[in-house]
Regions:
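C-terminal effector modules of nucleic-acid-centric enzymes and ribosome-associated factors
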Residues: 288-414, 457-516, 538, 573, ...
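Conserved nucleotide-binding/hydrolysis modules and their immediate coupling elements
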Residues: 229-231, 235-336, 373
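C-terminal accessory nucleic-acid interaction domains of nucleic acid-metabolism proteins
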Residues: 556, 563-647
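Short glycine-/aliphatic-rich beta-strand segments at the starts of folded cytosolic domains
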Residues: 329-342, 446-449, 523-533
Length: 647
């Protein structure tokens, strides 16, 4: 049986140490490594050793019982949350570690919410019970208050095959048929055991145990019970399907695509349908354990593996018969520019950043052609420091990043029609687009109401491709436009003169001309926050959120604790954790998750500070080009409508 398990926690809760113990007890590694000794098996990258934190979601393998386990040790720092989320996508089961001293911390909430989103069955391990101040019961109360009340203690069960009376009743109370059986006939071990496995797999109950990973207390016992209580049901007889969850370029520059097989089998030299539907041939299958791998000929459903030969699949793509694409919650809200040493050609260095972009698509590496600059999206300052070091180690490039800025976006709040015509000599394309405000955080949606007598289906699809093939600049700050519904009304091509690229020009001009006529709105990223403080600190938090232009829900209380939730601009709240720690003496807790884009609270000031001039953007123009007497001429946006050929 194949099982993929993930170890997740707030930074410094003991994830990597716990993972090392699992690998050691199952003889996957011969020597226990330690984070503080810089020899942990899964923190094999130099930067992880130096910083003492997990940056990459690396995997190990071990055999236990009748199962093969694929273990993923995930980053615990918020700056590397996208890496963690991509790993969660392929987990069959998760183990959340919580320190018995610190309890639930900010990132633990993020982990829990993501596991709920992906419906991953979850176990809890309360770690560091050997430390002064450890309070297991207090942590369990926190879990019940903040996460779930369906916690079940497995520490006193299954050692000799029996289940404690408390656990017997706990299971029966959560299944009406089982409760009736219990009342009539009493406890039946096999029935309860199967029902418990089913409830765990369905994320209806959440087993827990406690121990101290560093001292090897409770880990082996937990593994034994975890193995008994977890089952998977992958089908290798079905056609092959899988998720791409990671991409890396190895030391030779070979693109390595990591896949979780969901069904079927895959062999070397097999063709596989990738993200764009094209078939690509697998040239090599690798089975990784830490930084080492062995080549194999075939994989089956439920296995984690890597392939070479695949170039068109991206992180989050389904492959084989799976045609879905993942949409991730962990989205960067900051943007930074790369600064090179004198003498370095940024365009030549771009290829290295595009490799990083393939490995981590949340970076959204962008080449600003006019400025000859590289920009990328990031979660925070720690990520920038790590990227600087990675780029030097891998590519021998010394770079620094400018101070990151908020990543703004733009949209409109009224319906308009945009017209674009592109007709230099021996070229021709015309497009009419209806542009409407879309739902907030929906992106750009495209549909066509154009008749095939006007434009072929192929050209109509081409218009849609041009709308989503890149980020388009808004008029206010040059930030990406979003939340639009764009409908192709009509268009025209020329049998002789329409060439490749003509419709791209017409589409971009039509979109821009429509924006010129619209009411444009600046958007900024918001956090959803959850803050837990004592009740006598409610007033301070309410005042701070109001000053940060946030919106707060009605506070809730739980004993002497107050729970405050709401949304607030990233720009005004990104450093609030330090302030919270200061006035609560480190006892306040806060979790922040991306809440999408909403109207900017200080749009006028931002527009003035950025100073974007819509009339001199070399990549975009709202003017159209017409042809008369063998010569092309430009017509400004406010005069172009009257000259359109389709009107």
């Amino acid at each position: 049986m194949n099982k993929t398990i993930g170890i997740l926690a707030h930074v410094d809760a003991g994830k990597t140490t716990f993972s090392e113990q699992l690998l050691f007890h199952t003889k996957s590694i011969k020597k226990l490594g330690r984070v503080d000794h810089q020899d942990a098996f899964l923190d094999s990258h130099e930067i992880e050793k130096q910083r003492g934190i997990t940056v990459f979601a690396d995997q190990g393998m071990f055999e236990y019982g009748n199962s093969t386990y694929y273990l993923i040790d995930t980053p615990g720092h918020v700056d590397f949350s996208p890496e963690m989320e991509r790993a969660i996508q392929v987990m069959d089961f998760a183990i959340i570690l919580i320190s018995a001293v610190e309890g639930i911390e900010g990132h633990t909430e993020t982990v829990w919410n993501l596991l709920k989103k992906y419906h991953v069955p979850t176990f809890f391990f309360i770690n560091k019970i050997d430390r002064t101040g450890a309070n297991v019961d207090g942590v369990l109360d926190e879990i019940r208050s903040n996460f779930t009340k369906d916690l079940c203690d497995i520490s006193a069960s299954f050692t000799d095959g029996s289940i404690s009376n408390e656990l017997i009743e706990f299971i029966a109370e959560r299944d009406e048929d089982l409760l009736d059986y219990y009342m009539e006939k009493g406890y039946e071990p096999e029935l309860w055991f199967k029902k418990m496995q089913s409830m765990i797999q369905g994320a209806q109950i959440y087993p827990y145990a406690s121990g101290a990973a560093l001292q090897d207390i409770g880990v082996k016992d937990f593994l034994e019970k975890f193995d008994l209580l977890t089952v998977t049901d992958f089908d290798s007889s079905e056609p092959f399907s899988g998720w791409v969850y990671k991409i890396r370029f190895d030391e030779t520059g070979t693109r390595v695509t990591f896949i979780k097989a969901l069904s079927g089998t895959l062999k070397v030299r097999d063709g596989i349908a990738c993200g764009n539907g094209e078939m690509e041939k697998v040239t090599q299958i690798r089975m990784y354990n830490g930084s080492q791998y062995k080549q194999i000929d075939q994989v089956s459903a439920g296995e984690l593996f890597a392939v070479t030969g695949i170039t068109n699949a991206s992180v989050g793509d389904g492959v084989g018969t799976l045609e879905e694409k993942a949409v991730y919650d962990m989205v960067p809200t900051l943007r930074s520019k790369v600064v090179f040493e004198p003498g370095v050609n940024p365009k030549e260095a771009l290829k290295y950043f595009l490799m990083l972009d393939a490995e981590d698509p949340s970076l959204h590496v962008n080449w600003e052609k006019r400025l000859q600059e590289i920009h990328l999206h990031v979660m925070g300052a720690i990520q920038l420091e790590v990227l600087e070091q990675i780029i030097f180690e891998r590519f021998r490039l010394k770079i620094v990043f400018e101070q990151p800025e908020i990543l703004y976006k733009e949209t409109i709040d009224n319906e308009v029609i945009g017209y674009g015509h592109f007709e230099p000599l021996k070229h021709y394309a015309e497009v009419h687009l209806k542009i409407e405000p879309g739902k907030r955080n929906s992106g750009i949606l495209y549909e066509s109401s154009c008749h095939t007598d006007d434009l072929s289906i192929g050209l109509q699809n081409l218009v849609g491709q041009h709308l989503v093939e890149r980020e388009h600049h808004g008029l206010l700050t040059g930030s990406p436009i979003t939340d639009l519904k764009v409908t192709l009304l009509t268009g025209r091509a020329h049998n002789k003169h329409t060439h490749g690229g003509d419709f791209r020009e017409a589409v971009f001009r039509a979109l821009r001309q429509g924006l010129e006529k619209a009411n444009n709105i600046l958007l900024e990223p918001f956090y959803h926050f959850k803050i837990i403080v004592t009740t006598n600190q409610i007033g301070r938090v309410l005042s701070d959120v109001q000053a940060a232009y946030g919106r707060i829900d009605s506070p809730m209380t739980d004993g002497d604790k107050a729970i405050l939730t709401g949304i607030v601009p990233v720009a005004t709240f990104m450093n609030y954790s330090m302030e919270l720690a200061s006035f609560t003496q480190g006892k306040g807790r806060m979790s922040l998750t991306f809440a999408g884009y909403h109207r900017c609270h200080n749009a006028e000031a931002v527009i003035k500070r950025i100073g974007y001039d819509k009339n001199v953007d070399p990549d975009y123009t709202s003017s159209s080009i017409f042809c008369s007497k063998g010569q092309g001429f430009t017509v400004k946006w406010d005069e172009a409508e009257g000259m359109m050929h389709c009107l």
